[in-house]
Amino acid sequence: MKTILILVGKTTDKHFLAGISDYAERIGHYIPFEITTIPELKNTKSLSEEQQKTMEGELILKQLQPSDTLVLLDEHGKELRSIELAKWLEQKQQTARRLVFVIGGPYGFSEAVYSRANDQLSLSRLTFSHQMVRLVFTEQIYRACTIIKGEPYHHE
C-alpha cells in the first residue's frame, strides 16, 4: 500500500519544512510514502471562499485514482489517540491500494471533495496553522508506524 499526503500550498517555514522532511524520510523506512503539493491559487482576492474551495477541490480530485481511499484532515473529523490511529492505519494498509490524506487550503474542502472522501480525521479540537498541521500529522504517521512495529518511540 502506498500512502500519499496531499498538501494545498507550499510549506514556507524552513523549520516546519525540515521537520516534515525528516518525518517523511523516517516514514519511508516503514511504508511507501510521498508528499504531493498542489500550488496555492493565485489572484484570489476577487474569489469567494466557496469559489476558492471549488477550485482547490478540482485540483485535489485530479490527483486521485478511482480506487484511492481518501481521508481528509478536517476539524469535523474523528479524533483518535495515537494507539487508535496506529490500529486504524494498520487496518487501512490491509485493504487500501493507495491511502491518500489531504490537508486542505485555508477555507477547508469543497462539497465535491467531501463527497469523494472515505473518511475524515481531526488532529485536535484546537486550531493549528496549516504549516503546523503538516508537521504534527507527519509525526503522528511516523508514530503510528513505530507502534505497529512495536518499536519504543511511543510511550503510554
Each language-model region and where it sits:
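Loop/turn-to-beta-strand initiation segments
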Residues: K2, R97-V102
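Short hydrophobic segments within beta-strands
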Residues: I6-V8, T36-I38, V102
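S-adenosyl-L-methionine/SAH cofactor-binding core of RNA-modifying enzymes
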Residues: P32-F33, T37-R97
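Structured adenosyl-cofactor binding patch, chiefly the S-adenosyl-L-methionine
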Residues: E111-H155
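N-terminal beta1-alpha1 ligand-phosphate binding loop
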Residues: M1-I27
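Conserved strand-to-helix beginnings and helix N-cap segments that scaffold or border functional pockets
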Residues: L17-I20, S82-A86, Y114, R134
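Short, surface-exposed alpha-helical segments at coil->helix boundaries
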Residues: L17, S21-A24, T54-G57, E111
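Short glycine-rich anion-binding loops that position phosphate/pyrophosphate groups of nucleotides
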Residues: T11, E75-K78, G105-G108
